[in-house]
UniProtKB/Swiss-Prot annotation:
This is Histone acetyltransferase type B catalytic subunit. The record marks W177 as: Interaction with histone H4 N-terminus. The gene is HAT1. It comes from the Eukaryota. The keyword DNA damage applies. It is found in: Cytoplasm; Nucleus. Residues 142-306 form the N-acetyltransferase domain. Catalytic component of the histone acetylase B (HAT-B) complex. Acetylates 'Lys-12' of histone H4 which is required for telomeric silencing. Has intrinsic substrate specificity that modifies lysine in recognition sequence GXGKXG. Involved in DNA double-strand break repair. One of its GO terms (cellular component) is cytoplasm. GO terms for molecular function: chromatin binding; histone acetyltransferase activity; histone binding.
């Protein structure tokens, strides 16, 4: 070996690049790369000690039976402590007794046998069905304590680490976790899922004794459509199905989302706006300035939308309908929210700060409204110039 062969960069590869994910079905195999690998291989997302490293992590598209294989042309001849044992590292995050390593034939035989005896979800667990591009899809809601779901979730949960930033595994023994599963109706291929948790909702001291049954806050935790199915509307269908299911559940008083990223915020905003538009909400806004807090509170509870989200939606609707109340409503909220930071500033500086925040927010609201279908409808709300 030459001196160059001992340079660290010769033996280092991006773990995002090395890890190849595959969904295998009878007619094809779709390969794609993870977005994140730092939960498994560290913050640098690099693996040292192997040349031409390829990590194959494949799943049957129906059962999601996992298969793992690690290939490389040579291994660094140094201390074993310096090297990551890739097989052992990945098996920490996979169902160890359920994952087939290297023996591809055994893996294929295993998932084919499992497909023959696979047990369908119960009819009462089916909460929705929809069609995209002439293909039918179905959504099921299943408690994580269901043995079939618990085994399936152990197989798919690694995708939360690989595609959801800052995700971690949930406590599978907590009976309050529920899983919303999307799959193709014909051949039962897995499309995506969301984990959800019902938190007890404290109604306040005045109402606590009068409540006849427990009420809950429904929380969407992890939400993922697998990459091969992204960009086709599955996320909106899944989100709307969860919301519809919870709005029809009298025990759920409010719907919240745990640490949403920007793309999920957009999906949520657009679908909440579309839902409110279809319900005729845009024509029901009071004309008072400011809009009464009592009306805001009673209306958001009717739709089971959390306070911050409802405020955003209300402001976007005011902008969309050209209401002169838009600027007043937004600036009043910003003034209250930033009261401590604005204290002691000159009046002119406060106005400048509010105007800057207002314009930035309006620009973002315009961006979101532009994604809504009603913005392009001939009889949809027409945006007018807001007087400033």
């Amino acid at each position: 070996m030459s001196i160059d062969d001992f340079k660290p960069e010769k033996w280092t590869i991006s773990s995002n690049e090395a890890l190849k994910l595959s969904l295998v079905s009878e007619d094809n195999a779709i390969q794609f790369s993870p977005t994140f690998t730092y939960p498994i291989f560290g913050t640098e997302e690099q693996i040292f000690g192997y040349k031409d490293l390829v990590i194959h992590l494949a799943f049957d598209a129906i059962t999601f039976k996992p298969f793992l294989n690690v290939k490389f042309s040579s291994k660094f001849e140094g201390s074993e402590e310096e090297l990551v044992n890739i097989k052992e590292k990945l098996l920490e995050y996979l169902p160890i007794d359920d994952t087939i390593y290297k023996d591809e034939e055994k893996w294929i035989d295993s998932f084919k046998k499992e497909q023959e005896s696979i047990e369908a979800y119960k009819n009462d667990q089916n909460i929705d069905e929809y069609k995209i591009d002439n293909a039918d899809f179905e959504i099921y809601k299943v408690n994580l304590q269901d043995p079939k779901m618990k085994r399936f979730h152990r197989r798919i949960q690694i995708f939360s680490l690989l595609f959801i930033e800052a995700a971690s595994y949930i406590d599978e023994d907590d009976p309050k976790w529920e899983i919303f599963i999307v799959q193709t109706k014909k051949d039962k291929k897995f499309v995506g899922y969301a984990t959800a948790y019902n938190y007890w909702y404290y109604p306040g001291a005045n109402n606590f004794d009068s409540e006849s049954k427990y009420r809950y806050r429904g929380k969407i935790s992890q939400f993922l459509i697998l990459p091969p199915y992204q960009g086709r509307g599955h996320g909106s269908h899944l989100y709307n199905s969860i919301v519809k299911n919870w709005r029809n559940d009298s025990s759920i008083l409010e719907i919240v989302v745990e640490d949403p990223n920007e793309s999920f915020d957009d999906l949520r905003d657009v679908n909440d706006l579309e839902m409110l538009y279809k319900d005729g909400f845009f024509n029901k806004l009071p004309q008072e300035r400011p809009i009464p807090n009592a009306w805001i509170e009673s209306t958001r509870l009717k739709y089971k939308i959390e306070k911050r989200q409802f405020s955003r939606l209300l402001e976007m609707i005011l902008l969309s309908t050209g209401s002169n109340n838009f600027e007043y409503q937004v600036k009043q909220r910003l003034l209250i929210k930033n009261k401590d930071g604005l204290e002691g500033m000159e009046v002119s500086d406060i106005k400048d700060a509010l105007n800057k925040s207002f314009e930035s927010l309006r620009e973002d609201y315009d961006r979101i409204l532009g994604k809504c279908q009603f913005s392009n409808d001939a009889d949809g709300p027409s945006k007018k110039k807001i007087k400033t």
